[in-house]
A protein has these predicted regions:
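Short, positively charged and aromatic/hydrophobic N-terminal segments
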Residues: 5-13, 19-24
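Accessory RNA-recognition modules of RNA-modification enzymes
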Residues: 18, 23-223
Length: 223
């Protein structure tokens, strides 16, 4: 290898083939697509993904937070980082909670609902500090105040974006699945108001009653 070799891979996820994509950055250690590994999560990045390392190579993993010790499977490798899918949590972070949303692990609308709200506020403050430093701002002598939280961190959004799709001759409605354009069929959202939930239900019934077609990205037709 020179500095690295990247083999472009096209996967049929149902086939679970074993095409391998490798990268060599140290001349000694390599990762492979499909590789199983155990990782300690030490940080959370700006996308809400947990950050860990395998042989000093950075790996990002969804649905993990600082303090988690997890088993993952590598599914993508770039020049400077890899991405892994969470298989199981071996040791939970003390800041990890069970999400109150039954759609959370499918929906792409939220990234931190498995993190305690107190820790979310700390994460947001640290993100501001990190972004300012990354932009070259000298923070010496500057006090960054703590994030001001809410008494109840739910039902606060006045705008949400939901999409329609055709599935088994039925129209489904909801947000996109995380990292895809696949619509997740939901009945409510804990971030929007209860009035918005009711309006969502009315629209769903109207679509079914009047046999309105789901939006088709190719033709531009539908709702």
């Amino acid at each position: 290898f020179n500095k690295s070799i990247i083999i472009r891979k096209y996967i049929d996820t149902k086939a679970a083939n074993s095409i391998i994509k490798k990268i060599n950055t140290s001349g000694e250690k390599m990762l492979q697509i499909g590789q199983i590994a155990e990782v300690r999560i030490t940080d959370v990045n700006h996308m809400g993904k947990g950050v860990g390392k395998i042989n000093d190579f950075v790996v990002f993993i969804d649905n993990t937070i600082s303090g988690d010790y997890v088993q993952i499977q590598i599914f993508d490798i770039k020049k400077n980082y890899a991405e892994g899918k969470l298989i199981k949590i071996i040791e939970k972070s003390t800041d990890r909670i069970e999400s109150p949303c039954s759609f959370y692990h499918q929906c792409g609308g939220c990234q931190l609902m498995h993190m305690s709200y107190e820790q979310q506020l700390i994460y947001k403050k640290n993100r501001v500090i990190n972004e300012l430093r990354r932009a070259g701002v000298n923070l010496e002598g500057i006090n960054i105040y703590d994030t001001i939280g809410m008494d109840t961190p739910f039902r606060y959004r006045n705008k949400t974006a939901f999409f329609t799709a055709q599935k088994d001759k039925t129209i489904i409605m909801g947000p996109y699945e995380q990292g895809t354009y696949n619509t997740v069929n939901i009945s409510n959202c804990l971030l929007q108001s209860e009035a918005a939930d009711k309006a969502f239900g009315v629209i769903r019934k109207a679509i079914a009653k009047y046999n309105i077609a789901a939006y088709d990205k190719k033709t531009g037709n539908g709702f």
